[in-house]
Amino acid sequence: MRKLGFFFILLCLSWQGFTKETEEHSEIHDLMAYLLDPAAEAIWDSAGYVITEEGEFNLEPTDQEGWDKVKHGAKVISESSYLLSMPSRAVDDAQWVALSMALKRIGERAFEAAENEDSEELFKVGADLYQVCVACHQTYWIKEE
């Protein structure tokens, strides 16, 4: 009986921690912070050039591991579009779902560019990804007052 009481208390404490955590972050926040943001960064960090005083540096992946990282990010973006489109998460049906499905297409294009090791196409896809992100954030980002 003592063990049962201990497990009950442990369960209550676990639930309290879970509910506190979910109150601080929305599902959309967590989806963005832990899935989409890192996936987008994998694409943006692998396309284009950085110019510094030391010179110009190409961000294109130089090995299979680098291209695989881009492919992973592309798949996460593509498949996350379905998570965003779930009825419980859709802010409004038309525009929200359209922007979510735009991510699907962009993820597929990024994956294809990585498969072909096409850094120029990946750069274009990265620009398109940025535009979709900005369009969504301008419309739906909840600003704290």
Model-derived features with residue positions:
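The canonical Cys-X-X-Cys-His
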Residues: 129-140
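Sec-dependent N-terminal signal peptides
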Residues: 6-8
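Positively charged n-region of N-terminal signal peptides that target proteins for export
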Residues: 1-4
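Extracytoplasmic c-type cytochrome modules immediately beyond a signal peptide or single-pass transmembrane anchor
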Residues: 19-127
